[in-house]
């Protein structure tokens, strides 16, 4: 029989691994994990309400509902905030629900795309995750985390492709968590005036230090998502995606989802 310390470590490691995947999806370009360099236009806004989640062997975690707000504060730059209600449903233990970690960020496009040439759009989107969730209940990391990505995008008629990645600072005191990398790339097509469909593939290095009690928690993950964006009109949009892991799926990503509604203005 495992000791209480071992059991606590296992629960923490599972939560850390799943939270890392969820955080990656939350800070992405909805409904995907991969983001783009394009900010909200100056003095415009985006407001999302959404649910995201990931299931692994022995746990399902996610956010429902969560709220995301982006505002074009300056030309080529937007501010960003996500405030989620988070759930954790581990096998053999009580489910938890409450306030999750708060995300703040600023996206800045420093190279604009040459529509008629080869130059892509390039931007950065640094993020910080504040520990507003209760880590003891599996609802947050329990410490400050930060992400520093670079994103690139190019369009060709009805096709758009973008991707990139960056480095997550993820080491908390007295935890086995460690810094890691995330990379992703996406291809999307505007099928009709109202409907866009896309697919992405992504890779994330291990979020837990090697030498942990259970080696399963130290595994990297590679996965994919298929998604769609439907525009009801210029202000109202439906976003959804689903996917799974291709590498170490039982321990990192058996199934993941995003379902959201977006309102844009003015």
Where are these regions (language model features)?
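Cleavable N-terminal export/targeting peptides
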Residues: 1-31, 266
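Transmembrane beta-barrel domains of Gram-negative outer membranes and organellar outer membranes
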Residues: 26-266
């Amino acid at each position: 029989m495992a000791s209480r310390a071992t059991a606590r470590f296992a629960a923490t490691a599972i939560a850390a691994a799943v939270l890392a995947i969820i955080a990656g999806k939350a800070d992405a370009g909805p409904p995907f994990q991969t983001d783009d360099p394009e900010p909200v236009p100056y003095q415009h806004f985006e407001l999302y309400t959404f649910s995201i989640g990931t299931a692994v062997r022995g746990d399902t975690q996610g956010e429902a509902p969560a709220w995301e707000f982006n505002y074009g504060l300056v030309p080529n730059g937007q501010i960003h905030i996500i405030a989620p209600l988070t759930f954790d449903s581990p096998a053999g233990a009580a489910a938890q629900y409450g306030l999750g970690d708060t995300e703040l960020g600023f996206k800045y496009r420093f190279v604009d795309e040459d529509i008629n040439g080869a130059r892509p759009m390039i931007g950065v989107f640094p993020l910080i995750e504040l520990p507003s969730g209760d880590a003891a209940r599996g609802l947050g990391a329990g410490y400050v985390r930060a992400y520093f990505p670079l994103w690139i995008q190019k369009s060709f008629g009805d096709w758009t492709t973008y991707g990139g990645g960056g480095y997550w600072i993820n080491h908390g005191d007295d935890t086995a968590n460690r810094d890691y990398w995330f990379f992703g790339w996406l291809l999307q097509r505007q099928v009709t005036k109202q409907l866009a469909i896309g697919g992405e593939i992504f890779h994330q290095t291990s979020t837990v230090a090697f030498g942990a009690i259970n080696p399963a928690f130290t595994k990297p993950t590679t996965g994919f998502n298929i998604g769609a964006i439907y525009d009801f009109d210029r202000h109202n949009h439906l976003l959804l995606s689903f996917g799974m892991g291709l590498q170490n799926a039982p321990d990192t990503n058996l199934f993941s989802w995003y379902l959201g509604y977006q309102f844009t203005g003015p």
